[in-house]
Amino acid sequence: MEKSKNFRIDALLAVDPPRAASAQSAPLALVTSLAAAASGTGGGGGGGGASGGTSGSCSPASSEPPAAPADRLRAESPSPPRLLAAHCALLPKPGFLGAGGGGGGTGGGHGGPHHHAHPGAAAAAAAAAAAAAAGGLALGLHPGGAQGGAGLPAQAALYGHPVYGYSAAAAAAALAGQHPALSYSYPQVQGAHPAHPADPIKLGAGTFQLDQWLRASTAGMILPKMPDFNSQAQSNLLGKCRRPRTAFTSQQLLELEHQFKLNKYLSRPKRFEVATSLMLTETQVKIWFQNRRMKWKRSKKAKEQAAQEAEKQKGGGGGAGKGGAEEPGAEELLGPPAPGDKGSGRRLRDLRDSDPEEDEDEDDEDHFPYSNGASVHAASSDCSSEDDSPPPRPSHQPAPQ
């Protein structure tokens, strides 16, 4: 008997430290894994429920005779899923913790001091722990990934939605089937990720065009751009890019003409002032003034050419009259001139009246019959006829008498 008692004491001493360690490790893991105060209190409740479950489960073993203490110690030792659930911070929703943790606490209170087991509560707590452990194994990809409905939104915000949300629904269904009080929270858990598997498909369909555009642009393909407002007009100009012509209003044209009359060239401050007052850009005002100056220069040149032509016409008529008055005096003083002198005079007149422009040359050719050279030529022909017939000569001699 003494040996058996010593064996029991040694066995109890050998097993008690793991029990204390397991009892302390679960609350420590729960406290360190939780950030919110409410979830911390729920974690304490969950720990109480687990301890209550263990005490309730070991109470029937204490009533039996101590025939197999090793089997009893093995039954009391925590199972690997429970350790995994404790270290992975497996916690349901806060409301869920209030109900389940409270039940576990009551079960622990009854089972601890009175050594009285409640089979229904103990079975529900054990099933809940097993289902939570299974859910933790299925969802434990991220740190704290096996948390309940309260942890899912935070987990989705930090790590994104898990690809397989059906494991959470399966764990919820298992827990709801074990205890009727746990069934209210799982439609919310299922509703938290109803369209979640389709999210990657939607993202892929939405980003397909952008991805295709980026790949094509990096590959060097020419992609269609947004059509310009004058793309059709540009295509009709044989590939030439031409800006549309600016349509000025009548008020703008009047003001621009007024400014052009005041000054043909605008300074930059004045150009800015005119452009601002007329709701135009400085480039538009500058180009309008350039075009207006070119038009003004062309009109000025045309007026000068018309004035020169008029002066030539007047000069040609006056020269013909003067030549007719001078010729009789020359004939009286010097006699009939030689034919070579007449030709040289005509050539000098042609060189003096010549103009590089064709229209003026044509005008000069039209005016040649009225020019001095033409009259001299006519007189020379008369003189040549007079040279051939000597009788008209005496007719000129009585004139000086």
Curated annotation (Swiss-Prot):
It is found in: Nucleus. Residues 241-300 bind DNA. GO terms for biological process: central nervous system development; endocrine pancreas development; neuron projection morphogenesis; spinal cord motor neuron cell fate specification. Residues 302-314, 343-354 have a biased composition (Basic and acidic residues). Residues 56-65 have a biased composition (Low complexity). CDD domains: homeodomain (cd00086). The modification Phosphoserine is found at residues 77, 79. It comes from the Eukaryota. Keywords: Acetylation, Disease variant, DNA-binding, Homeobox, Nucleus, Phosphoprotein, Transcription, Transcription regulation. Residues 391-401 have a biased composition (Pro residues). Expressed in lymphoid and pancreatic tissues. Residues 355-366 have a biased composition (Acidic residues). It holds the Pfam family Homeodomain. Residues 37-78, 101-120, 299-401 are annotated as: Disordered. GO terms for cellular component: chromatin; cytosol; nucleolus; nucleoplasm; nucleus. The modification N-acetylmethionine is found at residue 1. Its main location: nucleus. Residues 40-55, 101-111 have a biased composition (Gly residues). GO terms for molecular function: DNA-binding transcription factor activity, RNA polymerase II-specific; DNA-binding transcription repressor activity, RNA polymerase II-specific; sequence-specific double-stranded DNA binding. It is linked to Currarino syndrome: The triad of a presacral tumor, sacral agenesis and anorectal malformation constitutes the Currarino syndrome which is caused by dorsal-ventral patterning defects during embryonic development. The syndrome occurs in the majority of patients as an autosomal dominant trait. Transcription factor. Recognizes and binds to the regulatory elements of target genes, such as visual system homeobox CHX10, negatively modulating transcription. Plays a role in establishing motor neuron identity, in concert with LIM domain transcription factor LMO4. Involved in negatively modulating transcription of interneuron genes in motor neurons, acting, at least in part, by blocking regulatory sequence interactions of the ISL1-LHX3 complex. Involved in pancreas development and function; may play a role in pancreatic cell fate specification. This is Motor neuron and pancreas homeobox protein 1.
